[in-house]
Amino acid sequence: MSGALDPKIQQEIIDRDLYATAVLSGNRNFDGRIHPYAKQAFLASPPLVVAYAIAGTIRFDIETDSLGNDKDGNPIYLKDIWPSDEEIDALVKVAVKPEQFRKIYIPMFDLGVNEKAASPLYDWRPQSTYIRRPPYWEGALAAPRTLANMRPLAILGDNITTDHLSPSNAIVLDSASGEYLAKMGVPEEDFNSYATHRGDHLTTQRATFANPKLFNEMVRRTDGTIKQGSKARVEPEGEVMRMWEAIEVYMNRKQPLIIIAGKDYGQGSSRDWAAKGVRLAGVEAIVAEGFERIHRTNLVGMGVLPLEFKAGVDRKTLELDGTELYSVIGNIAPRSDLTLVIERATEDGKNEVVEVAVTCRLDTEEEVHVYEAGGVLQRFAQDFLEGNVA
């Protein structure tokens, strides 16, 4: 299972609530990573992927059970079809030639020899859904971050992965990105995956928190249990809607946002869009019990302020429910103590202000400079312009 499914097969999975799985030779085995309807993914060598494809199921012992029968009804086992080292070496010798690589890669560096050198300025195409002029120096991203009166976009638990933050699986029609691509005239069979559209922010920003396995603690059933899915609750109205629709509401209001999370926020693949997506959504700060190292760096690079709760303090001890307004005050410096100011209404209708000490997770002076510039691209632009003036 990879990429788009046959619509009939996909509908069968939905109608029968099947526990569909994927077997792959890559390393992306997060829930829903290969496809939103693949509830689990198993990693295997390429020959094993072929063997499981022949069997059509994982509900058997591949070492002892048969994969199927031959034309005479005799059972066929894995050992019967498993290639020997000699067979593999012979195929590689026939199919892989050094000349293949020389023919492709050597001319790549002979610029202007075989064809006219291209202009260094890219001719942006407004209808492209694969590469588009990035918005990182204009609009909302050019405005100062106030870190004041922020609304929570999501309150999340532990072990939030970059795949929760910005999935890379196949785009389905009823997703926000799928609906956008359809409006752009792209047929469903050509939607491809989120990862292939990472050069187009209008497609990929709609993937922010689009993972169907997400648990946003702001979205609950009447019995108090958390609903699973790409959902958000817009405040102060308290209306629950699809995550992207909530982001659009807040973008139209120019409402600064914050994310509250548990331990190990941002683990998994070092995906740049996990940081880009939340910044484009208007998130100015993320307060968590802990950050994965690379993702924390990516947040700084996008101008999002990572803040860490002190030991013994978290979203549960503070009884956060998403109705609050958040502000951050203090001197931003490497690992300095800042104050998270939480304003909320009490049960008797009064306004309560809670001040919580948090650690600024800008860990070096250079990270402070990058953050203050608005991100690594903005810092690069500043240095470039200052260098030209000098």
Annotate the PLM regions:
Residues M1-A390:
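Fe-S-dependent hydro-lyases/dehydratases of central metabolism
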